[in-house]
Regions:
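Aromatic- and acidic-residue-enriched carbohydrate-binding clefts of CAZyme catalytic domains
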Residues: 87-125, 152-189, 195-197
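Well-ordered alpha-helical segments embedded in enzymatic catalytic cores
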Residues: 16-19, 66, 124-127, 190-193
C-alpha cells in the first residue's frame, strides 16, 4: 500500500466526495482500489479522478506541472485542441461537444473514443484557453467539420457488415455519415458560440 484514505459516505443521494492520497514512495506501476468496509453494501460511482495537488501555476483543475512546464519551455506560438479524431468522434453521436467540456467536472458528459478508452473531459476548453493564456500561446480550437472521424464505427458493425477480406467494404462502413442538414444550423450556432466564448 503506497497511500490510503478513508471516506465516510453519509448519504443515499448523489454527493461529491474528495480526499487526498499522499504516496509514501514512488512506484512505477500502481493500482487504485476502492474497498467497502461495510459489507454487504452497494456503492454507485459516477466519476473517479486522480488529480495532482501541484498543478501548473496552481490552477484548480490545472495541468500537471511538469508536463505543462515542458510545453511552456518550448514557447509555442499556438496550441491545438483537441486532436482531430477526438474532435470528430466515434460516430455522429460522439462528435466532441465543446459545451460539454466546460463547467464542474462532475457535470461534464464523458466520451468514449476511437482508441477504446473513457475520456472524462477533465481537460476541457476552459482549461485549454487558460493554459494558452498562461504560456502566451494562441489557441487553435479544433472542431469537427460536421462528420465523424473516417475511422469511426463499432467493431460489431464492421464484423456484421463486412465479408472476410472485403477491404473496400470495411472502409465504406468506417464512415458513418454527417450531421443531417436540418440540424446544421444548430451545429453552426455551437461553433459561433465557441468563438464568442
Amino acid at each position: 500500500v503506497c497511500a490510503e484514505s478513508v471516506v465516510k459516505v453519509a448519504s443515499r443521494e448523489w454527493k461529491k466526495y474528495k480526499t487526498v492520497l499522499t504516496a509514501a514512495s514512488a512506484i512505477d506501476k500502481g493500482r487504485l482500489e476502492l474497498l467497502l468496509e461495510s459489507v454487504p453494501a452497494t456503492l454507485h460511482l459516477d466519476m473517479v479522478s486522480l488529480f495532482p495537488q501541484n498543478t501548473f501555476k496552481g490552477r484548480e483543475n490545472g495541468l500537471r506541472a511538469d508536463l505543462a512546464q515542458t510545453l511552456a519551455d518550448l514557447h509555442p506560438r499556438f496550441i491545438r485542441f483537441p486532436g482531430g479524431c477526438v474532435a470528430h468522434g466515434d460516430g455522429i453521436d460522439n462528435i466532441y461537444d465543446w459545451k460539454g467540456s466546460v463547467g464542474p467536472l462532475e457535470a461534464r458528459k464523458p466520451l468514449r473514443n476511437l482508441w477504446g478508452y473513457h475520456q472524462t473531459r477533465g481537460l476541457g476548453y476552459f482549461e485549454y484557453f487558460r493554459f494558452c493564456e498562461d504560456i502566451d500561446a494562441e489557441p487553435l480550437p479544433v472542431l469537427a467539420a460536421g462528420v465523424p472521424c473516417q475511422n469511426s464505427g463499432t467493431h460489431s458493425h464492421y464484423a456484421d457488415n463486412c465479408p472476410q477480406g472485403a477491404n473496400k467494404e470495411l472502409m465504406r462502413y468506417g464512415q458513418q455519415g454527417g450531421i443531417p442538414m436540418e440540424e446544421m444550423p444548430a451545429y453552426i450556432q455551437d461553433v459561433l458560440d465557441l468563438i464568442e466564448y
